[in-house]
């Protein structure tokens, strides 16, 4: 298509048409610096490839995308690369002397609004799949947080770079992270790719309180506008794809409960804790239960009644009189789980008597040791906490499933790798992902670090046969943005936290899906 200029008369004609929404693609430093002397102040080939891939690729091969840019941005593109091939180049200029006559795939407009009006009308509404605003500074300052901006694809440059052009910070009251890549380093610069999606039309839009979190109530299908290369990067697909694979290809196995499972061995998921919190959204996960159980572990308690009194009943089945008698713990008081997780974390090696005893100063406090090593010897390869104590297994109501955690410090970040010998994909794993992610965030907080990665290694990853149908229902749901979790900055001691110290915002999952626990 030859060059087109949109004038005021055409703008008037298009005023009745709805404007196109758009997505922003930009690379910026922590200070939101984007340029120096009219140029990019970095050389990041991986970022340039990402820019090309996201702006060029369409799901419909008969369509193309549009890239909207200011005149200075156009002129900063090397002549041999302009116009950007395979895309409609929309150049914003009010200069009458700007001449790009006879240039294919280029149109000029006088403003962002006039460009969006043009792209909403024929023929462009039929031929353009997505609209990307790509710069420069003036255009991005106007476009970044407008209601018509659906998403922001931000290359976050973690290293300080001298810039003279800046854009506003992303308004996190209306945008939430959809995906964030793991950091990489190229030409001395550390960076990652993060996509933010609009979840509210404005910061004033109300939210509801639900399940101990602030809920925004948005539809998972709303985010299908994202390029597939971005949509598929949502980390919940790691879990969903694993469940689907186990149901389709798992080994048929018997188990101690007599229920029967489909099982695979040696699976792994890796979650990025830097921007969001991996609380699954394709079904509701009991966040308050996650928090209270972890605090119960940290306290060293083995008394299921402590959780019961708070309305948390996840341990009831393994603490009942019938169950304890059934595994030979006939002398054990109902509710006494024996030397399970919290006892091993805080009193490893101590002799267990019952849930009422005071074990202060007894055994080895692994949690305190982990914190001490993170603070004082962060390069130690022995920053480890184990709940697996063979000499105590016979005394436990249930041997530990999530049994071994190793912590790793680098770049001012704390990461955790946890090994889980037995992984109930339907009920347990969503809880375990959240629990160890929260533990990592807590330890980072008390050690003045920031959360990094949570790597979840699963030994026997299984789906109970009774969970196949509800999990197939869950697989039909599309993910929504993970929530954001913040910790009370006033609390710096691991034993000082209470449930209200954890602020979870933007959690709006699909409905709860019932699954019966196999005991």
Swiss-Prot record:
Gene3D superfamilies recorded: Dihydrofolate Reductase, subunit A (3.40.430.10), Thymidylate synthase/dCMP hydroxymethylase domain (3.30.572.10)
Ligand binding (substrate): 25, 47, 134, 155
Pfam families per the UniProt record, alphabetical: DHFR_1, Thymidylat_synt
Keywords: Acetylation, Methyltransferase, Multifunctional enzyme, NADP, Nucleotide biosynthesis, One-carbon metabolism, Oxidoreductase, Transferase
Single Gene Ontology MF annotation: thymidylate synthase activity
HAMAP family given in the database record: Thymidy_synth_bact (MF_00008)
Name recorded for this polypeptide: Bifunctional dihydrofolate reductase-thymidylate synthase 1
Organism from which the protein derives: Arabidopsis thaliana (Mouse-ear cress)
Source species taxonomy: Eukaryota, Viridiplantae, Streptophyta, Embryophyta, Tracheophyta
């Amino acid at each position: 298509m030859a060059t087109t200029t949109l004038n005021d008369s055409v703008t008037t004609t298009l005023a009745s048409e709805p404007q196109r929404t758009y997505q922003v693609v930009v690379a910026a430093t922590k200070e939101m610096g984007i340029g120096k002397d009219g140029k990019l102040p970095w050389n990041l080939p991986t970022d340039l490839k990402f820019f090309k891939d996201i702006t060029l690729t369409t799901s419909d091969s008969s369509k193309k995308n549009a890239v909207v840019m200011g005149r200075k941005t156009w002129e900063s593109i090397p002549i041999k690369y302009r116009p950007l091939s395979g895309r409609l180049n929309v150049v914003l200029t009010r200069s009458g002397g700007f001449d790009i006559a006879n240039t294919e795939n280029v149109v000029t407009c006088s403003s962002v609004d006039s460009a969006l009006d043009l792209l909403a009308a024929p023929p462009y509404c039929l031929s353009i799949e997505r609209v990307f605003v790509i710069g420069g500074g003036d255009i991005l300052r106007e476009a970044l947080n407008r209601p018509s901006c659906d998403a922001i694809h931000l290359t976050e440059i973690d290293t300080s770079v001298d810039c003279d052009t800046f854009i506003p910070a992303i308004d996190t009251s209306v945008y939430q992270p959809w995906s964030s890549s793991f950091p990489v380093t190229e030409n001395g610069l550390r960076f990652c790719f993060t996509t933010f999606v609009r979840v509210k039309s404005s910061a004033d839009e109300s939210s509801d309180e639900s399940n101990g979190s602030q809920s925004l109530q948005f539809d998972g299908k709303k985010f299908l506008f994202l390029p597939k290369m971005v949509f598929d990067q949502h980390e919940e697909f790691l879990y969903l794809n694993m469940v689907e694979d186990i149901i389709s290809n798992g080994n048929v196995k018997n188990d101690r409960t007599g229920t029967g499972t489909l099982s695979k061995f040696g699976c792994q998921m890796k979650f990025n804790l830097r921007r969001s919190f991996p609380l699954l959204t394709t079904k509701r996960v009991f966040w308050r239960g996650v928090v209270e159980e972890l605090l119960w572990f940290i306290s060293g308690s083995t008394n299921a009644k402590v959780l019961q009194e708070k309305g948390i009943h996840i341990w009831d089945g393994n603490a009942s009189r019938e169950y304890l008698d059934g595994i030979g713990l006939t002398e054990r008081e109902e509710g006494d789980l024996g030397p399970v997780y919290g006892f091993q974390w805080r009193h490893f090696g101590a002799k267990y008597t019952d849930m009422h005893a005071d074990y202060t100063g007894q055994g080895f406090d692994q949690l305190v040791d982990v914190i001490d090593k993170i603070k004082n010897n962060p390069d130690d390869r022995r920053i480890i906490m184990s709940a697996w104590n063979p000499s105590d297994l016979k005394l436990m109501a249930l041997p530990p499933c999530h049994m071994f955690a190793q912590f790793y410090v680098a770049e001012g970040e704390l990461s955790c790798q946890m090994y889980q010998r037995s992984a109930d994909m339907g009920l347990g794993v969503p809880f375990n992902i959240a629990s160890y992610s929260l533990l990592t965030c807590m330890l980072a907080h008390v050690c003045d670090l920031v959360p990094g990665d949570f790597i979840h290694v699963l030994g026997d990853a299984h789906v109970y046969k009774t969970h196949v149908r509800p999990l197939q229902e869950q697989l039909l749901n599309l993910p929504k943005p993970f929530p954001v979790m913040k910790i009370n900055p006033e609390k710096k001691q691991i034993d000082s936290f209470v449930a209200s110290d954890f602020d979870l915002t933007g959690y709006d999952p699909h409905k709860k899906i019932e699954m019966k626990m196999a005991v």
